[in-house]
């Protein structure tokens, strides 16, 4: 049985979308929702879907927001991927400068820290030692210069080992100072040497003093040869004839001055604040020389040598030895004169 031929231009019923047979795909939900049947209309008639009115003014904003959200999501995914990418972390660590790695390792290395502390301690100790040596050099020079100015001879000074001189300079309190002269002379007394021990010095500038000295003890040694030269200088014309040699007698504490024409025996004694050579025996050969004249000359000479020391220094005792005369001087709680009162102390 054959199908009747339709008009040549009539499309085949198999090509119609609306009549696809029982095996055709059912219409989509959107199509079913938009096409509704109305009463009075034929069953094959499907109403065209009515599109909602467009709002052109909101479409650009919606598209912009959608594009912004899409860009944000892509950026977030890329950032998360980069943040959790172990390969990127390894690459960043490999690119870290070697100096920074070495510095971090040095901070964590106990040996390096210990060596740094040792170096710092050594530098501080070296600076302290250098400052101590410099302070001692300056202080020794000033004290020696003052003593040399008083005794008219070269002098050397030294401060005690403890406490540190830097601390003594800071507190202006000096505990122990030792001074020794060269032994050439003290003023005009030839062959005389002095050794000083100075304690408890406190420097404090006042109109009348530079400070105080708690205690000063001096040991003065006068050699036999020095006594001879000193007496010869004290008697300008007859000195060489009066004293050609000096012999000491420790047993009786006398000094014998032998000359070409005389023989004088004198005893060193403490007189006032200094020393004197008191004539015990005086013998002349061939000429007459008054004993009083010789005694007066010796007194003036020894007075100029051993009296009127600064700081109130005075003689305490004297002793005759086999090599000369040893005397001891001292002072307590003495005021240090200013540079105006005594130029020898101007640098203290």
Swiss-Prot record:
A cellular component term from Gene Ontology for this protein is: plasma membrane
Pfam families reported in the protein's UniProt record: LmeA
**Residues spanning the signal sequence:** none
Q: Where is the composition biased (Pro residues)?
A: 1-11
Which key words tag this protein in UniProt? Cell membrane, Membrane, Transmembrane, Transmembrane helix
Where are the residues of the annotated region Disordered?
Answer: 1-83
Q: How does it sit in the membrane?
A: Multi-pass membrane protein
Report the subcellular localization.
Cell membrane
**Keyword Transmembrane helix, does the record have it?**
yes
Q: Where are the transmembrane segments?
A: 111-131, 235-255
What else the UniProt entry mentions is: Was identified as a high-confidence drug target.
By what name is this protein known? Uncharacterized protein Rv0479c
